[in-house]
Each structure stands twice: as C-alpha cells, then as structure tokens.
Amino acid sequence: MVMNFVRNLFFFVLAILSSFWISSFWIAQTFTPSSSYQPVEVIDGAGLYKKQRTDGNEAYLQVIDLHKMQIDQLVGEVDDMGLGQGKYYQGEGKHYSPFFKMKLFNEVTDEYKELYSHTVFSLINCSFFEQYKSSTQLSFPIKFNGEVITGGHSPYGPVSQPADKFYSNIRLKALVWDDAGAYITDYDPATGAPLNESRVKNAIVSYQYSDHPAKVLGKNQANRFHVIGTLDFDGIKGDELLLIMTVNRATLDEAADLLRQLGVKGEIITIDGGSSTYLFNSRKGNIILPQPANQEDNPTFRKLPHYLGFRTRDKKPVSPLIKVSQPADKVQVEQNKPYLILWRDNLDSDVTIELYDGDKRIEVISPRTASNGVYEWTPKSPVKEGYSLRISSLKNRKIFGTLQL
C-alpha cells in the first residue's frame, strides 16, 4: 500500500511538472526569423528585423503579436464628406468617400509619441489615396473603431467602369484585426462584408499583392513596397501574428516571397508603397521616408492621409490628451447630412461632444461616447460659420480639443 501511495504521488508530481514545463515552453516561445534577419529592436510583443538581400538592397520585417500589441489607425480630419462618392461599400454611390487631411509624417509621429510616449514601437503609412492635394479621398474602404469611414474612390477596382478592364473582376481583400489576432479574407463591395459585421471593429481593404497596379500595369518593376500577411505561431486556432515586410527595392513578387519563406501560407496584401513608403521605429527613428518625385512640383507628396501605429498596451500613466487638427480646407457641414468628427486621445474614459458659438454652448451632440477617435454626427439644424466642435474628457472637462467649423 505504501509503495502504491509513493508511486501515485510520484506520477502526480510528474504530471504537474510536465504541465508546468509545457505551459512555460509555449509561453516562452516567440517567433524568431532566420539568422539572415538581424534584430533592430525586439520587445515583448513585437520585433523589427533587417535583412540584407543578395542584390545589396534591404528588407525590414515587423512581427506584431496582437495578443500584446495595439494597432492604431491615424487618419487626417475631414473637410468634405464626399457624399455619395463611395464606390466599394454596399454598392457604388451608397456610402460617402470623405476628403481626409494630408499630414506630414513627422508631425504624425511626434503626436503619436506625445500621446503614448515609451509604448510606441513603430509607424507605417497605410491606405492608397486618390488626390495629391491638401486633402484626399482614400482608395478603398476603411473601418475605424467600429465606423466605416470611407467607401473608397479608386478607379482601379471592381466597379462598373474601371480605369483598366483587368480590374473589372478582381477580388479586393480585407485585413481584419482585434486583440485576439488578424485575418485576410475576400472583400465584397456589394454587401460590405466583412466590414458590415458588428464584431469587426478595425479593418482595411486593399489589393492582393499580385493585383497592385504597379505589378499589373507597371510591369512588376522593383520599387519600395509594404506587403502584409498573418501567421499562427502559438498553435491555438487563429493567426495571432501580423507580419509586415517593407522593401526598399524589390518587386512585389520578391517581397511576397520573403513572407512565404517565413511561413505565411494565407493571403498576402499590399498597402500604399512607392514614394509614399514610410517606416519609423522608436529605437532606430525614421528608416524609410516618403519622397516627392519633385519637391517643387509636388510638395504634398511627403504628406499622407492614413497611417498605422503600433504600441504596447502598457498602462503606465501618461498625461491625458485630446488632439484635434484643423482640416486642410473649410469644413463643409450641412443640415441632415453626416459629418465625421475625428480626433486622437489617450484617455481611459469616455468623452462628450458639444457644439459651441464662441464660449457659448449651443448643443450637446453626444453627452457620452467612447474615446475611440471617431463619431458620425448628423446635425438637425443649420450649422453657422464660426461654430466649433469641442471634444472633452468626462473625467476632466479641462482636457478638450476644438475643431473650428
């Protein structure tokens, strides 16, 4: 009997130790690329690596663990809503396609660091856009913290009269992410799926890398590109890793092949590249900068409308801030028509949105709404020139941002 007791106790302890070892093994595991990728910065939840390619050019790999990292969409304020101009959300002409302010990359980066301090890991440019002016429409739909903020306006896509017949029947792709992981799937412009699903809070629509006009119409020339894929590394259902490959000179096929070599088996998308390509890292600084083809002819080229920021979910206190920039041109707000109020904040509580005439409050637009940077407002009465919008912290009304109308 004593021997049975000892034996059972031994196996019980062994089972506990084995369970602990296995758990520790999986917890400790992190994705590490091959030795040809040299670490630039590696933190708990993210890594930036540099690869010197055989042709002398460079590739930068970012590995983002969505269980640990936050992705923020950073988009310029709206001056014109582009009502009825959306081409890719629930049918042509069924959604708006606003004009978003083009913002200088270093101003966006500086503001992001001001909001999130030491938690910032990196920034990249993101969405394709249509006009090289002070504000621009984005090419394809974006869902930002639960709100579809544009239906897209590109002529190079599956619309009734595309700029090139190749694009009549292509399948656009949606990159969807949340705290649990990310996936890339077919996008349906007729229904808006998957962006029309309430569970989807953040998503971008873009090209499968092989459908990018630079490959199809530009004969697949080498250039600067970002390509993005997802990867399951922890063995649990779903892809928790986002892999972003940024090349300073390569074809799209070569860039995508680098992701395949790292184990990406699913869809691979591309976002805006070429002269728009931007890559910033908190340790290294600006790695790849947007470049104008001709600074005199195209001074707005270094300004871009849409960025992605990556940061840790560190809860260390930072000074609470609400940041609002004045849109590029005069704001056009019309009675009974929607207008997107956009801002950035680092608050951990809700905000209130109010309409002011000077120091006089005219209307409470929303007594309480999430501090997520976006609110669609449809004014019920005429909005006079000179009115302003005020977004204030409910915890401390002295913390606010103002948008002049």
What are these regions (language model features)?
Residues 125-216:
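Active-site-adjacent helix-turn-beta-strand microarchitecture at beta-sheet edges
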Residues 47-63, 74, 195-234:
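Conserved beta-alpha junction segments in alpha/beta enzyme cores
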Residues 10-23:
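Hydrophobic membrane-insertion alpha-helices, especially the h-region
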Residues 1-13:
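N-terminal Sec-pathway targeting helices
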Residues 24-166, 245:
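Zymogen propeptides
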Residues 320-405:
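Extended, solvent-exposed regions of the mature portions of secreted/cell-surface glycoproteins
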Residues 133-159, 211-270, 276-318:
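Conserved, well-ordered active-site substructure
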Residues 123-126, 268-272:
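Active-site neighborhood of phospho(di)ester-bond hydrolases with catalytic His/Asp-centered motifs
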